[in-house]
């Protein structure tokens, strides 16, 4: 497994294509949510893109956003593993690496996420707690969650 954590400007054209393709595959096609997948947050100079490759195939991805971009705190979004890579513990490795990267980039900062409601217990396992009621985003139940003062795992 090859891991890369890069700002937008350091992504290769192949990495950019790969991450946009898997995001559309998962969030637009698989979850049947026809919405604009691209936004200005990807290009923010402090946004970090965390990519995991297995044999030159992008199998997991998320982005780390600095405070003030989507939440007042640091945030993690667009968390995904590709279909054939699921059920192998890759999501846990991805989130652990994300928390470590956030600690390096923004030491001891609180982290917020807009989690799909059915993943609440998963994120609780990392110390996140619900901070909102359930709400619909693109017709999918979500809940805001927070990890106070992220620590290296």
Where are these regions (language model features)?
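A short beta-turn/loop motif at secondary-structure boundaries
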Residues: 39-44, 68, 136-137
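A conserved beta-turn-beta hairpin within the catalytic core of GNAT-like acetyltransferases
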Residues: 67-76, 86, 105-109, 139-141
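Conserved beta-strand in the GNAT
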Residues: 51, 57-66, 73-75, 80
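Short amphipathic alpha-helix that is part of the acyltransferase structural core
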Residues: 1-57
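Conserved GNAT acetyl-CoA-binding A-motif
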Residues: 95, 102-116
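Generic C-terminal helix-cap and adjacent flexible tail
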Residues: 148-153
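Conserved acetyl-CoA-binding loop-helix of GNAT-fold acetyltransferases
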Residues: 81, 87-100
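Conserved catalytic-core motifs of GNAT/GCN5-like acyltransferases
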Residues: 112-114, 124, 129-144
